[in-house]
Amino acid sequence: MGQKITDEHNGIVFEVMEDDTINGKKERRHGVYLVPNLITSLSLLSAFFSLTLSADGHFYKAALAIFISAILDGMDGRAARLLNAQSPFGEQYDSLADMVAFGLAPAMLAYHFALQYLGRFGLACAFVFAACAAFRLARFNIQIGVVDKKFFIGLASPLAALLIASSTMVLLDLQINFAQSNLTIFFAIWTVVCGLLMVSNVKYYSFKDFDRKKVPFVVLMAMVLLMVAVIYD
């Protein structure tokens, strides 16, 4: 049997089993891999809810769901490093979930919220954002271990998605009728600009050298639960 290791992090105790040694060979215990992949699945689920909420016209809740996905996206990698459960499968699964959460979900939010009033042009603008997110994620995948981790090449897809979500919230508070407003074209331009920033060659500081231990894991989970409560209120 493997040796049990107890690791305490920000007040949370994790118990992880080391690799078992059977007939002189180490057998990796796969249970710990479920934790980060489960968090990734929750991020994907939140993105799926955002898509359905956008289609039903619940734009504020759809935007909140994108915020939840962004928080969970930061938590899965953190959990993987903490549990030493990083894997190629987890990286690919996370990337596919990010495409839904930060590519499709914000694009559909922008379209149903405002761009639909521009007809095919609005649909094209939403597609540009989604396509740029796909390009950005693909480029990020092949640059892992190649570029300086302190910087992103192009705006990170979660941040671009949050720009769409937060601007939607602001415009909802202003109670603008996009069916009769000239601001619709500006929102379309804004959507395209956010997309193009993702595929630009501009370097953005990644904050990956920031001490994330200052933000306890339980605080992030509390933020997620609070947003979930607002969505289902």
Which residues make up each language-model segment?
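C-terminal membrane-associated helical module and adjoining short loops/tails
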Residues: 1-24, 149-233
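Topogenic membrane-insertion module of multi-pass membrane proteins
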Residues: 1-74, 203, 223-227
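Interhelical loop and helix-boundary elements at the membrane-water interface
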Residues: 4, 15-44, 79-99, 138-159, ...
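Membrane-water interface of alpha-helical transmembrane segments
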Residues: 23-26, 30-40, 56, 60, ...
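Multi-pass membrane catalytic core of lipid/isoprenoid biosynthesis enzymes
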Residues: 33-40, 82-137, 167
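Hydrophobic alpha-helical transmembrane segments of polytopic
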Residues: 39-42, 62-66, 125-132, 160, ...
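Helix-coil boundary and interhelical linker segments in multi-pass alpha-helical membrane proteins
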Residues: 49-64, 100, 104-124, 167-186, ...
